[in-house]
Design a protein with these regions (language model features):
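Flavin (FAD/FMN)-binding glycine-rich loop and adjacent Rossmann-like elements that form
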Residues: 1-186
């Protein structure tokens, strides 16, 4: 319910500013609930999160970058590690309040789930690391879709499975065969 824009999620001063501002926004929300929502006349805030949730900061560059076209076309990658991913685009304006002006919220013609390739989890320049969750390699628009919790859970399972295969086989995560991951996930 609270919101702030124009914050650099990688800068501790900006994070402190955002946390302070969003905590200030709680009081008017409580007052609104007390006045306009039956049953909330005596509501109060017990606590708030210790850290503000940042929707998006930097994007890692993986061996493949997932795009909105991949999602809209329900593209099936040979090296998929997530399949059946399905969520609406939830693009927020990165330069100010409100929704993005691209119209992506209205453009959702995806009729079946899409896949996410293993290459999105493998960073281009870093060895021994896998990306998972909302930090996989993808465009700003694609991120608004794959950052949903069910998809992030599946990405975490895929990354953990790949890491286990790499350790057991004595190879780099970069060299794990996606077919081996698929066997374990199915």
């Amino acid at each position: 319910m609270t919101n702030i824009t124009g914050i650099d999620g990688t800068d501790e001063r900006d994070m402190t500013k955002a946390e302070t501002e969003c905590r200030k926004q709680i009081i008017p929300i409580i007052n609104f609930l007390r006045e306009y929502v039956p049953g909330y006349e005596k509501c109060y805030c017990i606590s708030s999160a210790s850290l503000i949730g940042i929707r998006e900061t930097r994007h890692f560059k993986g061996e493949y970058t997932l795009t909105k076209d991949d999602i809209l076309s329900a593209r099936v990658f040979d090296d998929w590690v997530v399949k059946g991913a399905h969520f609406n685009f939830d693009v927020h304006n990165i330069t100010g309040a409100g929704l993005d002006k691209t119209g992506m919220q209205k453009q959702f013609s995806q009729t079946k789930g899409y896949t996410i390739p293993y290459r999105c989890l493998v960073p281009v320049k870093t060895e021994g690391l896998l990306l998972c969750g909302r930090n996989i390699s993808g465009t700003h628009i694609a991120h608004s879709n794959f950052r949903a919790m069910p998809i992030c859970f599946a990405l975490g399972e895929a990354a953990g499975t790949a890491a286990a295969i790499a350790v057991k086989s004595g190879i780099s995560v970069r060299d794990v065969d996606a077919a081996k991951i698929q066997e374990k996930l199915i």
